[in-house]
Amino acid sequence: MHWIKCLLTAFICFTVIVQVHSSGSFELRLKYFSNDHGRDNEGRCCSGESDGATGKCLGSCKTRFRVCLKHYQATIDTTSQCTYGDVITPILGENSVNLTDAQRFQNKGFTNPIQFPFSFSWPGTFSLIVEAWHDTNNSGNARTNKLLIQRLLVQQVLEVSSEWKTNKSESQYTSLEYDFRVTCDLNYYGSGCAKFCRPRDDSFGHSTCSETGEIICLTGWQGDYCHIPKCAKGCEHGHCDKPNQCVCQLGWKGALCNECVLEPNCIHGTCNKPWTCICNEGWGGLYCNQDLNYCTNHRPCKNGGTCFNTGEGLYTCKCAPGYSGDDCENEIYSCDADVNPCQNGGTCIDEPHTKTGYKCHCANGWSGKMCEEKVLTCSDKPCHQGICRNVRPGLGSKGQGYQCECPIGYSGPNCDLQLDNCSPNPCINGGSCQPSGKCICPAGFSGTRCETNIDDCLGHQCENGGTCIDMVNQYRCQCVPGFHGTHCSSKVDLCLIRPCANGGTCLNLNNDYQCTCRAGFTGKDCSVDIDECSSGPCHNGGTCMNRVNSFECVCANGFRGKQCDEESYDSVTFDAHQYGATTQARADGLTNAQVVLIAVFSVAMPLVAVIAACVVFCMKRKRKRAQEKDDAEARKQNEQNAVATMHHNGSGVGVALASASLGGKTGSNSGLTFDGGNPNIIKNTWDKSVNNICASAAAAAAAAAAADECLMYGGYVASVADNNNANSDFCVAPLQRAKSQKQLNTDPTLMHRGSPAGSSAKGASGGGPGAAEGKRISVLGEGSYCSQRWPSLAAAGVAGACSSQLMAAASVAGSGAGTAQQQRSVVCGTPHM
């Protein structure tokens, strides 16, 4: 049996392996191809000829298709191998082709849809190339000397399904409609067509297949391959070759093979397993053929005789009175001396005229037809519960010599039967039955059987029209509406449930209540809001908003007032905005105070933000201006220090440097460009004009006349001759205190007043020792210094000379030539010869 199963399994596996050769196919169904202009993918005419005037192609295309199916590619390579296959069709038409008529193209060897069978598990993705070519010589190669009309590239995820997926591709000149799908071959199932299942009903299996390819056994078959039949239900010791069959194993029998076969020759026995013999009661022996209880099995004694087993299948019978024989089969009809029918010393008397032919006179204490019954007397105490009385035999109960008087609850000849006076129970309504049959009634009932319900309403009166209802050992008052309590003495207060809504006041009435409503509400329970808008109080197109005990009018543009009966003097825009916001807020259920608060905040918050922005802007601007002012003052202070340095040096070189720095606007815009080796000069990179050193008092008047021609703020540079005079009005303009945080040039050597020795030409050119002997002037000196020292210059209001004249003055001073008048002329720009 085992080798048959192995052979069956091997055959099935071999069949499955051999038949897995193709699992499904990809199908492409071409439907419509349109190329109305007869052009290729580059816009050229397929025929190569066109109308010169209209540009219309004169000829038509001869269209064939090439289809290539391959594995999924993120970027489709049109030149690589078609891994799933490719198909080249014959010429199917000209410019436009209707491919839905499959019968039309069968003669050309073209089958639509185009199928690409595969013998692997479908991966779920694909790449498809569909090309339309123009063929001029109807060759088999679609790409040789042909023109490409259209190329379609498709890459998609596609599941196995019998439904077609419709697509359409359009280009500048062409369009193509097509369908595609993937289906499994017959007997292949699953998402990849990889599960094989073939229906069969033969010796190798009996099954069908589900939609997913699972094996489903036919009725009556089971097993992995549905090759095992299901035997009849209850078949215990059997097998089957067909469904619902039960072929018994050796030693079993019956429809369900549940009966064992007895040992051969077993007569009076059973079995619980094959080939056994279990003897029935009264039988023994190897085959259960020996009778061990003849009396029980055969009952040989008749006429009431008693049988006794004597062993080995033998027995004896004890006959009842009046009978005789081995089996007590003979009835006695006379007083035979050998067989006396009367027992217990009874005397037999022949009476031929009777049926039995004799009669027995029993001895004292016995009775019965054959004197077989003992006569009892009171001495035997036969009465169990009663009183015993001796009587003559035959007069008592059943011929006995006594008679019993039974007490209540007992009966029977011997008072041994207890009477059940409570069965069935005579007491009703829950009464308790006593052994004597008397009923003890529960409270509320009376009578022999507790059948009477005591009227508990007697002596109890219900008030206010209530009705008394009698109950078991109690009563209940059914009150009329409006009253309650045990005797209906209390009035129902319907106001306890607070039926009045919206603050209404409740007044209790008889079985009713009355609500006194607040202003603005009405109804039985004050739940109805009175619509104050029902009368149309709003005029001039105003919208009425119902309120509690009031109304509110949302006025149209141009009107105001409680009822919109006044013309509005506010702007239309403001009214519309205000009332629109108010309407929306009130529609949202806000109170007037909330609406006002929201309106104030909606206006105030943007205003506060604008004010804060303005304050920040002004503070920044103020800081910027203060910074610029401090920077300007610092620059001015540094420039004055620079001029003072030139005066201190007293040389033509220093003046020339000052002229170059102060008058160099035609050069670079770098401002002051003193020698970087001079530590006493701070360079000015802003190229601003500075206040120069004052000239002599005599030059002040001439400077005032030439002030208009100066480009700077008007000032003079002293000549070398003036420098030689110790009492000259020449001085350095006083320096002002700088308010700027920037560092100033406070070198103490800058502000020494020139002495006669230090102001000589030698000192100017060589820087003699007199330069260090003059009085030191503090950088932070008083502002009145120059005005006290040179009152004439202060009166003229001259601060300095322009940079261009300063250069000329420096030249004259450096050479030592020219008079003071010439020097002044050069400085102020007035030519004097």
From Swiss-Prot:
It is a single-pass type I membrane protein. Changing K398R: In strain: sonoma_017. Keywords: Developmental protein, Differentiation, Disulfide bond, EGF-like domain, Glycoprotein, Membrane, Neurogenesis, Notch signaling pathway, Phosphoprotein, Repeat, Signal, Transmembrane, Transmembrane helix, Ubl conjugation. Changing L662M: In strain: sonoma_008, sonoma_015, sonoma_016, sonoma_032, sonoma_034, sonoma_038, sonoma_040, sonoma_045, sonoma_048, sonoma_050, sonoma_061, sonoma_073, sonoma_081, sonoma_085, sonoma_094 and sonoma_097. Ubiquitinated by Mib, leading to its endocytosis and subsequent degradation. Changing A761T: In strain: sonoma_006, sonoma_022 and sonoma_040. Residues 227-258, 256-289, 291-329, 331-372, 374-416, 418-451, 453-489, 491-527, 529-565 form the EGF-like domain. Glycans are attached at N98, N137, N167. Residues 19-594 are extracellular. GO terms for molecular function: calcium ion binding; glycosphingolipid binding; Notch binding; receptor ligand activity. The chain crosses the membrane at residues 595-617. Changing V812A: In strain: nps_19, nps_21, nps_25, nps_26, nps_27, nps_30, nps_31, nps_33, nps_35, nps_42, nps_43, nps_45, nps_47, sonoma_002, sonoma_003, sonoma_004, sonoma_005, sonoma_006, sonoma_007, sonoma_008, sonoma_009, sonoma_014, sonoma_016, sonoma_017, sonoma_022, sonoma_024, sonoma_032, sonoma_033, sonoma_036, sonoma_038, sonoma_045, sonoma_051, sonoma_053, sonoma_054, sonoma_055, sonoma_059, sonoma_061, sonoma_064, sonoma_081, sonoma_086, sonoma_087, sonoma_094, sonoma_095, sonoma_097, sonoma_106, sonoma_107 and sonoma_119. It holds the Pfam family DSL. Detected in all areas with neurogenic abilities, for example the neurogenic ectoderm and the primordia of the sense organs. Later expression is restricted to those cells that have adopted a neural fate. GO terms for cellular component: apical cortex; cell surface; cytoplasmic vesicle; early endosome; endocytic vesicle; endosome; membrane; plasma membrane. CDD domains: EGF_CA. PANTHER family: CRUMBS FAMILY MEMBER, DROSOPHILA CRUMBS HOMOLOG. This is Neurogenic locus protein delta. It comes from Drosophila melanogaster.
